[in-house]
């Protein structure tokens, strides 16, 4: 009995050691990725220290050994555009890899804005797009004041299809299509953007040395305690604002809710929407909620069909009701509401 137990434990220990030695790749090195053509390409990851790592790509082998910190890296030589190819990294198999031009797209909300929010003007184009030679990956939002991250979970590649096109950055979508039209080689878009972010937030500590004030701010945010204090303060202010906005909104508490069609609005003022003064009081803008009501006539032929409501640029958010039914809302300016399949008839 003792002999059998020792044998089983030996096997389990060996299995445990084997599983721990498994090579790991960052999320961005995955199925469907695009590698830069005609330039050396780095492939990297993690494993147990001293682990042998072999990368096989286009029938060529590239080997290395994981260092003391478990990190490893191999460099592929410059390659011509083409694909799709497969790659193996020890026991990991990656499929549908292209070699072409890889572009980093970064910026604020103008780069984050998705193609799905410009379908009003480009609906037919976006709905019919299918190009497996165009790939896209959006880097998930996140920050780390202690240095670059080894991995970014959720950074998954997608091909351009009519289903995925609305998820693309609108700017990157049209850019990628134009680049492919010009070059006829695979195009990979890496979208690392964050609305409202300052350029200093993207700079390294070394790059900030010439900017003392921004460097001081960075040093402050290096403190986990300071960041936690800022987060708590921000959450508290948001709760205060949300509560004050809700309690102070007469449209929600003055008898019949102002989104109801039976509301008597005869004492409401008529507003000149092209005037800059309707949202101001004593020369200053009024922060809070503004309610508008508009009656429109819908023909029998139009009734029951899908429709699009264009409100233009709304700052900062809107909620829309038709005959008392919520048909959509927008957070952040461009308001384009598609009215379809309501829970009950609108007309």
For each predicted feature, which ranges?
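Bacterial Sec-dependent N-terminal signal peptides
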Residues: 1-22
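Glycine-centered loop-to-beta-strand initiation motif
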Residues: 66-75
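Non-catalytic, glycine-rich low-complexity segments
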Residues: 21-49, 95-105, 112, 272-283
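Short, aromatic- and glycine-rich surface loops/edge beta-strands on solvent-exposed regions
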Residues: 82-91
């Amino acid at each position: 009995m003792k002999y059998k137990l020792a044998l089983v434990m030996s096997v389990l220990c060996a299995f445990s050691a084997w599983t721990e030695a498994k090579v790991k790749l960052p999320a961005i090195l995955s199925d469907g990725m695009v590698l830069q053509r005609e330039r050396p390409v780095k492939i990297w990851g993690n494993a147990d220290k001293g682990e042998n790592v072999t990368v096989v790509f286009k029938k060529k082998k590239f080997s290395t050994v994981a260092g003391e910190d478990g990190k490893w890296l191999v460099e592929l030589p410059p390659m011509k555009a083409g694909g799709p190819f497969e790659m193996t990294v020890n026991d990991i198999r990656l499929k549908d890899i292209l070699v072409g031009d890889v572009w980093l797209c970064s910026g604020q909300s103008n780069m984050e804005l998705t193609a799905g929010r410009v379908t009003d003007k480009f609906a037919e184009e976006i709905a019919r797009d299918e190009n497996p030679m165009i790939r896209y990956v959006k880097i998930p939002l996140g920050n780390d004041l202690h240095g670059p991250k080894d991995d970014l979970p959720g950074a998954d590649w997608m091909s351009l299809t009519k289903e995925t096109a609305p998820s693309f950055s609108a700017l990157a979508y049209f850019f990628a299509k134009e680049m492919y039209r010009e070059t006829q080689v695979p195009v990979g878009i890496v979208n690392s953007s964050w609305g409202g972010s300052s350029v200093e937030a993207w700079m390294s500590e070394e790059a900030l040395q010439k900017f003392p004030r921004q460097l001081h701010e960075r040093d402050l945010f290096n403190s986990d305690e300071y960041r936690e204090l800022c987060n708590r303060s921000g959450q508290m202010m948001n709760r205060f604002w949300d509560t004050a906005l809700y309690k102070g909104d007469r449209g929600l508490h003055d008898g019949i809710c102002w989104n109801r069609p039976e509301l008597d609005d005869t004492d409401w003022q008529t507003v000149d929407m092209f005037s800059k003064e309707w949202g101001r009081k004593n020369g200053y803008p009024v922060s809070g909620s503004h309610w508008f009501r508009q009656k429109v006539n819908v023909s029998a032929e139009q009734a029951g069909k899908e429709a699009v409501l264009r409100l233009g640029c709304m700052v900062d958010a809107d909620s829309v009701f038709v005959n008392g039914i919520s048909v959509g809302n927008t957070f952040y300016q461009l308001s384009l509401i598609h009215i379809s399949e309501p829970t009950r008839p609108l007309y």
